[in-house]
């Protein structure tokens, strides 16, 4: 019998984080799944690490060459997927145990693509050590939804195609994929639950040179051992965002008085979405410069946004 969900974990030469990301999948309350860990031409011990997990639902796949981005590993996962639903998980990210059950419930109610809230842990690389990221709809031309928090029907990518190579694009491949799904009139659903923890490599200079896993280990233990982790972490993070100087998303008195979870989350989503919508409109409606403007710069080559990110993370530019 085929699994209901195929979880695709793209990875490249960072084996120490894999037990934590894969472990967060195997602890899901929804268990009808397979896990495809797809190496982007890995040359380290990732295959051995995956093999030691010892769960028949977990399969290792390795591309013959390194392609430089998660797009091609994700496409290979799509080709080999047996599930009717597709989920993505960054190799250094974690899911809360209810992630799949919440998002699949939204799909069974009629959505084609569902996504939850993500906690971004920046590792103290700037003055904000963490922030909540409700996936944002800036309008039909700008949809920011981290792949780690997404589950979609397999039929979506069967119809519109998979991930495009980053060298074909001016922007991020995930944004382009969501835009294609949106313009093809697929139905998106935001589930108002914290379901994923993201450790963005673009917030950690040279992280691929060090390849640490201590953050994933610590957060994994907290998710497993803390009572009411989701609600407690929402409150802690909103407090931290207020103290650290981020725009206060809701009245602080509601946090201090431990308002009901649904009210707290609803207000946070509503207020944060308003701010991000305003920001998004500014991003997509900047006036075009007139020809000959002295501030004009040569257009960036396609894929440059990914090449710059690779260098920051400690990876070389692809040839």
Residue spans of the language-model regions?
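Conserved nucleotide-sugar donor-binding catalytic segment
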Residues: 135-222
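Conserved short acidic donor-positioning loop in nucleotide-sugar-dependent glycosyltransferases
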Residues: 13, 25, 40-44, 53, ...
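Short, acidic, metal-binding catalytic loop of nucleotide-sugar glycosyltransferases
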Residues: 23-32
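Short alpha-helix within the catalytic core of nucleotide-sugar-dependent glycosyltransferases
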Residues: 19-23, 47, 83, 96-108, ...
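Conserved donor NDP-sugar-binding/catalytic core segment of glycosyltransferases
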Residues: 94, 98-128
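Glycine-rich, basic loop-to-helix element that forms the pyrophosphate-binding segment
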Residues: 64-81
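A conserved acidic beta->alpha catalytic loop
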Residues: 39-48, 65-67, 90, 96
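Short aromatic/hydrophobic "clamp" motif used to bind/position activated sugar donors
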Residues: 86
């Amino acid at each position: 019998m085929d699994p209901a969900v195929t979880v695709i974990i793209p990875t490249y030469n960072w084996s120490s984080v894999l037990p934590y990301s894969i472990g967060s999948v195997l602890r899901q309350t929804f268990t009808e799944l397979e896990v495809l860990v797809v190496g982007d031409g890995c040359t380290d011990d990732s295959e051995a690490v995956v093999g030691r997990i010892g769960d028949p639902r977990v399969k290792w796949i390795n591309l013959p060459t390194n392609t430089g981005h998660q797009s091609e590993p994700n496409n290979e996962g799509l080709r080999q997927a047996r599930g009717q639903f597709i989920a993505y998980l960054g190799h250094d990210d974690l899911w809360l145990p209810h992630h799949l059950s919440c998002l699949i419930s939204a799909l069974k109610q009629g959505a084609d693509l569902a996504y939850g809230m993500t906690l971004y842990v920046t590792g103290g690389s700037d003055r904000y050590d963490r922030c909540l990221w409700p996936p944002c709809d800036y309008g039909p031309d700008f949809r920011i939804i981290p792949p780690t928090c997404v589950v979609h029907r397999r039929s979506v990518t069967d119809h519109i195609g998979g991930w495009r190579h980053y060298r074909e694009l001016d922007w991020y491949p995930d944004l382009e994929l969501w835009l294609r799904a949106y313009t093809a009139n697929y139905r998106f659903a935001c589930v108002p639950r914290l379901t994923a923890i993201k450790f963005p490599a673009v917030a950690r200079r040279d992280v691929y040179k060090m390849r640490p896993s201590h953050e994933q280990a610590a957060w994994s233990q907290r998710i497993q051992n803390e009572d009411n982790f989701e609600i407690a972490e929402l409150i802690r993070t909103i407090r931290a965002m207020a103290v650290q100087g981020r725009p206060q998303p809701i009245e602080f008195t509601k946090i201090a008085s431990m308002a009901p979870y649904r009210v707290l989350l609803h207000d946070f989503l509503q207020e944060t979405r308003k701010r991000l919508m305003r920001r998004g409109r500014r991003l997509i409606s900047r006036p075009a410069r007139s020809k000959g403007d002295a501030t004009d710069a040569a257009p960036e080559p396609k894929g440059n946004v990914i090449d710059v990110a690779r260098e920051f993370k400690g990876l070389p530019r692809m040839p």
